[in-house]
Design a protein with these regions (language model features):
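Alpha-amylase-like alpha-glycosidases and glucanotransferases acting on alpha-linked glucans and related
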Residues: 3-11, 15-21, 53-59, 64-91, ...
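Catalytic domains of carbohydrate-active enzymes, especially glycoside hydrolases
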Residues: 27-51, 75, 325-337
């Protein structure tokens, strides 16, 4: 797509705050009015997928897709066409410093919680996997509880559930993944009784085979790339096998769901929560009250906001994946400027900006350089 000729540089921008109450379709309707004001460029607040209901968009949960609350790709393309037809340009707000991780809706963060240091996205976040507190070795602290862990556990405010072919821990709006290797705790409970009753029926043998496969999965502390790839491949196969088995065998489904009930304990019987406690101790995260965040948290945040985790933009793979959408728009000639949010929070702001300039400047000079502005003014030292 060839951009409509306009001024060589954004001379007058008008910021449009995008949210579910002001979408791409709404923005499209404002373009003629903005042109009449002499505006050269529409400047959009973040348009990547943000936390549901976000009214600002800076809590991005997936940087590589458009925010569905703002509209679909066709509606965005119509907005772009309208901007071009009126001889105007487009400037985007970019958020490289942090991501929204609240309610485990961020797929990168969710992957880290499920797979720990062996997660494909473990290097995306600034997590101290070896903090002074030994209980947090190879774990990330999750200060999401409204009270002390023991009180929440025994009040049954969090519960084990089986949903979408996986075991998860549900705590109000949080749906926390459980390491597939730890599923052996759930599936092996009362197994001898099932074997006796099932008389080695094929469904029981399949469950035993699934248990063997789970036990052989590489652990969450695995660092060998080949073993990590094996972990990702095999865990998905095992998930599918268990889901199929539960769909086809009422006996196995009843067995598993009864174990889920048992693991959730009985209020008033402290010892009945030992099974769930042991299961949670096997995870790559440690649940805690929000009150301990300032003292024990081991991941870098945006200021002191627990729901905004800092990103390691100095990692090349993280940089490329998180800027996928922006780089695509630049190549297509859709965007000619960007405003970088909180650049001073990055590990190396200058290096980041130089790298962004390199990747957005065509070597053949076919396009004008991307206009890059930053939110913060950095001191000369």
């Amino acid at each position: 797509m060839t951009p409509t000729p306009h001024t060589a540089f954004p001379l007058a921008t008008y910021r449009l705050q995008m949210h579910r109450g002001f979408t791409f379709a709404d923005a499209t309707r404002t373009v003629p009015y903005l042109q009449g004001l002499g505006i050269t460029d529409c400047y959009l607040s973040p348009i990547s997928k943000a936390a549901p209901g976000s009214d600002h968009g800076y809590d991005v949960i997936d940087p590589v897709v458009l925010n569905p609350e703002l509209g679909n790709e066709q509606e965005f393309e119509e907005f772009v066409r309208t901007v071009r037809a009126h001889g105007m340009g487009l400037v985007l707000d970019v958020v490289p410093n942090h991501m929204g991780i609240g309610k485990t809706l961020n797929r990168w963060w969710r992957d880290v919680l499920e797979n720990g240091p062996s997660s494909r996205y473990a290097t995306a976040f600034d997590i101290d996997w070896h903090p002074i507190k030994r209980e947090l070795e190879n774990k990330v602290l999750l200060p999401i509880l409204a009270d002390q862990y023991g009180a929440i556990l025994e009040s049954q405010e969090m519960e084990l559930v089986y949903e979408d072919s996986a075991f998860v821990l549900r705590y109000y709006d949080h749906h926390l993944p459980l390491s597939p290797k730890s599923w052996t705790h759930i599936l092996s409970h009362r197994l001898e009784q099932l074997v006796t009753e099932g008389e080695q029926a094929m469904p029981v043998m399949e469950l035993q085979s699934i248990l063997t496969a789970l036990k052989n999965l590489p652990g969450t502390g695995e660092r060998n790339p080949e073993r990590i790839a094996e972990h990702y491949r095999e865990k998905e196969i095992v998930k599918k096998r268990l889901s199929t088995l539960m769909d086809e065998s009422p006996m196995i489904r009843a067995f598993v769901m009864e174990n889920v009930r048992i693991f959730n304990g009985e209020r008033g019987r402290s010892e009945s929560f030992d099974l769930l406690d042991a299961l949670l101790n096997e995870q790559a995260y440690r649940l805690a009250s929000w009150k301990v965040a300032s003292e024990e948290i081991n991941y870098r945040r945006f200021f002191d906001i627990n729901e905004l985790a800092a990103i390691r933009m100095e990692d090349e793979a993280v940089f490329l994946e998180s800027h996928q959408l922006l780089l695509q728009f630049v190549r297509q000639g859709i965007v000619r400027g960007c405003r970088i949010d909180h650049v001073d929070g990055l590990y190396d702001p200058v290096r980041y900006l130089h790298h962004l300039r390199e990747l957005t400047t065509p070597p053949d000079g076919s396009q004008a350089p991307l206009c890059i502005v930053v939110e913060k003014i950095l001191g000369k030292d």
